[in-house]
Regions:
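C-terminal "lid/loop" region of Rossmann-like NAD(P)-dependent oxidoreductases
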Residues: 252, 282-283, 292-297, 305-323, ...
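Amphipathic terminal alpha-helices
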Residues: 26, 343-378
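N-terminal Rossmann-like NAD(P)+-binding domain of SDR-like oxidoreductases, especially those catalyzing
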Residues: 1-217
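Hydrophobic "lid"/C-terminal helical patch
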Residues: 17, 269-273, 297-300, 347-354
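Non-catalytic, hydrophobic alpha-helical segments
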Residues: 265, 269, 285, 296, ...
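Glycine/proline-rich active-site loop of Rossmann-fold NAD(P)-dependent oxidoreductases
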Residues: 194, 207-212, 219-235, 243-245, ...
Length: 378
């Protein structure tokens, strides 16, 4: 499989993946719409990600919602790595048609073409998301393994941000979420990613194509957009700090995420492309370590040597999860995947990269006003 199509290949994960595959002598085609939200008004000037790949790949400016663009991009390919997606969890709650059209509709178009036209595709690798788990797996002292429902506005407005047992109502203990955990997304983005993965795993085996899915945790590292206020708290916090603006920590600052470095994500994805035994499997990709958001903010201020006010405000967004971190046992077993980048090591590299970039316009307040207007920010 030496001819590989990467949709969203000018994005953060896609561009890094493309460059690594080129190093491994793959012929890479990229299909990307160069979304303004990610790449700016003039990608030639404002998108280092696009510039890093545009002369090294067969680049097609187009959309996964266009059958014509898919047909052009799929010509001569052996495999597809489908990364193109709208990715803002909060934004998905009020731009519903956009998220469903791109994430579900784009995947449906791909599968329709593969089902009804001649092609050489042997494997489809699709990016799902940890968002499909919703709150994920927990343990209750009385009820054992449980999967909490979405947190209630009536609890959070009183400062009770932790998850409750759906059976007895007690607070529950976070544990690592495995791939066979209950699927219970709490955002439109999560629902779209769930359906995207289900479509691929349902259709591909019927047409002789191997499906492989990755549920990425919170991916970060050099190259990620510093101007997009809808995804990535490391970028959001960094842009706030560099502009001398304070950081508003949602909830109580104890909410956690599993932050996984871009190089580890690229490594896992290539293993999923190349490993025969990966066919038909879904893999978590993370570090298996939970880091709280307050620690992220303090660490970034320390790395940049800039002090800004850090306020734990008690504000919250409907649709956000409280905690999640991945169990990566399956990826270790089948793919031989082992994350090499700890959070401390990764954030050091990320901060060094940010220090070399132009300070971006801080659009965070604009995104908050949008969510307030939709009743999603409390």
């Amino acid at each position: 499989m030496k001819n590989v199509l990467i949709t969203g290949g000018a994005g953060f994960i896609g561009s890094n993946l493309a460059l690594k595959l080129i190093d491994k002598s793959y012929q890479v085609t990229v299909l990307d719409s160069l979304s303004k939200q990610i790449h700016g008004d003039n990608p030639e000037e404002t998108s280092p990600l696009y510039r890093s790949v545009k002369d090294k790949v067969r680049f097609i400016l187009g959309s996964v919602t266009s059958r014509e663009d898919w047909l052009k991009a799929l010509e001569g390919q052996d495999a597809v790595i489908h990364l193109a997606a709208e990715t803002g969890t909060g934004q998905s709650m009020y731009e519903i048609e956009k998220y469903v059209s791109s994430n579900i509709g784009g995947t449906a178009l791909l599968l329709d073409i593969l089902t009804n036209t001649k092609h050489n595709i042997k494997r489809v690798v699709v990016a799902e998301s940890r968002a499909i788990y919703g709150e994920g797996k927990y343990e209750c002292s009385s009820c054992g393994e449980v999967y909490p429902l979405e947190r209630k506005d009536e609890d959070m407005c009183k400062g009770d941000f932790e998850c409750h047992c759906p059976k007895c109502g007690k607070h529950v203990k976070l544990v690592a979420t495995t791939e066979d955990s209950a699927i219970h997304p709490s955002s439109v983005y999560g629902v779209a990613k769930q359906v995207q993965g289900q479509l691929v795993h349902l259709v591909c085996p019927t047409i002789g194509v191997d499906p492989v899915s990755f549920r990425y945790q919170n991916v970060y590292g050099p190259g990620q957009s510093l101007s997009n206020p809808y995804t990535g708290i490391l970028s959001i916090f960094s842009t706030r700090i560099k502009n001398g603006n304070g950081i508003n920590i949602f909830e109580d600052g104890k909410e956690t995420r599993d932050f996984v470095y871009i190089d580890d994500v690229v490594d896992a994805t290539i293993r999923g492309l190349e490993t025969p035994e990966a066919a038909g499997h879904v893999f978590n990709v993370g570090t298996g370590v939970a880091t709280d958001v307050l620690t992220v903010a303090k660490t970034l201020c320390q790395k940049y040597g800039i002090e800004v006010p850090i306020a734990i405000s008690g504000n919250y967004r409907l649709g956000d999860i409280r905690h999640n971190f991945a169990d990566i046992t399956l990826a270790r077993k089948i793919l031989g995947f082992e994350p090499r980048w700890s959070f401390d090591k990764g954030i050091e590299q990320f901060a060094k990269w940010v220090d070399k970039q132009e300070i971006q316009e801080d659009k965070y307040d604009m995104s908050i006003e949008e969510m307030k207007a939709k009743g999603l920010y409390k």
